[in-house]
Regions:
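Alpha-helical membrane-protein architecture signal
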Residues: 2-7, 183, 187, 220, ...
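Membrane-water interface at transmembrane helix exits
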Residues: 11, 160-164, 208, 212, ...
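Helix-loop-helix units of permease transmembrane domains in multi-pass membrane transporters
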Residues: 14, 157-199, 461-462
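A structural motif at transmembrane helix-loop-helix junctions in multipass membrane proteins
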Residues: 15-16, 231-269
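Membrane-helix interface segments
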Residues: 17-18, 181-182, 219, 251-254
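Secretory targeting signals
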Residues: 25, 29-38, 134-153, 192-249, ...
Length: 463
């Protein structure tokens, strides 16, 4: 019976030239979205590779200097922290996952490169405050955008009149003469049209695998997880369509109802929630970042007495030998410490605000299940906000370690030797593999509830 229904629907599909054209158009749009993600990835990959190659060349150049340097009682310029850092041209790169091609997420908002110089504040690289993925609403033109926003429209266009059209054309009486019940026939026809709507997604799945599998860092498990989330989302919309059809509306009402559900789930609810969350957790004003830069200048202009007072509060062990320490180094170190502390304070305020908003959004996924899908895509693609926060915190920690290492060497040693150079702290990337299953729980539960409600309705009809 299923084969007969599929054959019938396939013949109907071939007769509908407009539907075939629509499938080709949606497939072309999907290809364009995938290409846009690939362009962003390629641009970032080239930027990172170029910057890291330059960093390696600079490191080798400075290393050669320390291989031949002759030390004396007076430090050479290369042995001073600022000159050494300027020569090293240190930069830290975030891991760019191949799956970011599918879900750009925060990838086009935040640069994947941050200066590793201990005195180059993070706000020089990124002026804007954090933004959450759900706040992007329509999002980026990538595969996740196509799946989240456009796939439902294609499915709704294929199925809105699936049941009502038979009655409107006067052929519904023929369906009652079939061996199978009308509900079974409806489910089989709906399944076929859902599979037709999935054709562009199948195309993107195979094409994306062909594009990504050879890229460095590609993970088959993560790839399957990403597309698993996509097909779970597609299943959710299948159940939504089935549930609306159980109400036995005519084609016009079905179209309006399904379009209303699309607007509600993808535009209205996320938009209202974001407005509320922004009110509850206002983003850090860019004026505060500008004021931090003014603070930077004020610290360098403060008196030497104030600088030394702050320094000795942190390094009391230096008091005994302070007469032997160059006061200029103390002033510079003190200023750098104060600026970094202020930068960490401001960055923590921004990060804590973002974390508070993300937790609030997580609770709202029960009424905004699409938000959970968007966040899952971003996490699997390593482009989520939480991963960006972890990256920037790791860079802050790295810069602080370097600051203390360079200046403590000046305080407690006569020279900065080759051995000291080889022990310069290195950056370690934090573990950014986050669990995303909890974000899909609302969508999964809502899908099961809709299936249950549809089953009850079908059972009552059969009775």
């Amino acid at each position: 019976m299923l084969q007969t229904i599929f054959t019938y629907e396939w013949k109907q599909l071939l007769r509908s030239k407009g539907l075939i054209v629509a499938l080709f158009i949606f497939t072309a749009i999907g290809f364009f979205c995938l290409k846009q993600g690939a362009i962003v990835y390629q641009y970032q990959r080239i930027s990172v590779d170029s910057a890291m190659a330059k960093k390696i060349r600079s490191y080798d150049f400075v290393k050669n200097i320390f291989d031949t340097i002759k030390h004396s009682n007076i430090r050479s310029s290369i042995e001073t922290p600022y000159i050494l850092e300027r020569r090293l041209q240190d930069v830290v790169a975030k891991n760019i996952s191949p799956l970011s091609v599918l879900s750009i997420g925060q990838g086009d908002i935040y640069a994947p490169l941050i200066s590793g110089h201990f005195n180059n504040e993070i706000f020089k690289n990124n002026f804007s405050e954090f933004k959450n993925p759900e706040q992007l609403l329509a999002g980026n033109l990538d595969a996740s955008f196509f799946i989240v926003f456009l796939f439902p429209l294609l499915l709704l266009a294929l199925t809105y009149n699936l049941q009502s059209a038979d009655k409107e054309l006067g052929i519904d009486s023929l369906l009652y003469t079939q061996a199978a019940s009308v509900d079974v026939l409806f489910r089989q026809r709906l399944l076929f049209r859902w599979l037709i709507a999935l054709l562009p997604m199948f195309f993107l799945t195979f094409l994306s695998f062909w594009l990504l599998y050879s890229l460095p860092g590609f993970s088959s498990l993560s790839f399957l997880q990403w597309w698993g989330v996509a097909f779970l989302y597609a299943l959710f919309w299948l159940v939504v369509v089935a549930l609306v059809h159980r109400l036995k509306f005519n084609s016009l009402v079905n179209a309006i109802s399904l379009a209303g559900v699309w607007v509600l789930l993808l535009i209205a609810i996320p938009g209202l929630l974001n407005t509320w969350f922004n009110f509850q957790n206002p983003a850090t004003n860019k004026t505060e970042i500008a004021e931090f830069r003014d603070y930077n200048a004020k610290i360098w202009d403060q008196s030497s007495e104030n600088k030394r007072k702050h320094f000795f509060a942190n390094y009391i062990q230096v008091l005994k030998g302070s007469a032997n320490v160059d006061s200029n180094f103390i002033d510079i170190f003190s200023s750098a410490l104060q600026i970094l502390d202020k930068e960490k304070e401001l960055h923590n305020v921004i990060a804590n605000n973002a974390n508070a908003q993300m937790k609030a959004e997580e609770k709202s996924f029960w009424i905004n299940p699409v938000g959970g899908v968007v966040r899952s895509f971003a996490i699997i693609g390593n482009t989520g906000l939480e991963q960006q926060i972890q990256f920037e915190k790791a860079v802050m920690k790295y810069r602080e370690e370097k600051l203390h290492y360079f200046f403590e060497n000046i305080l407690f040693q006569t020279n900065f030797t080759k051995k000291d150079f080889e022990k310069i702290p290195t950056y370690f990337e934090p573990n950014m593999e986050l669990k995303f299953g909890k974000y899909l729980l609302p969508l999964s539960l809502l899908t099961l509830i809709a299936i249950f409600l549809s089953s009850i309705k079908i059972k009552n009809n059969n009775q």
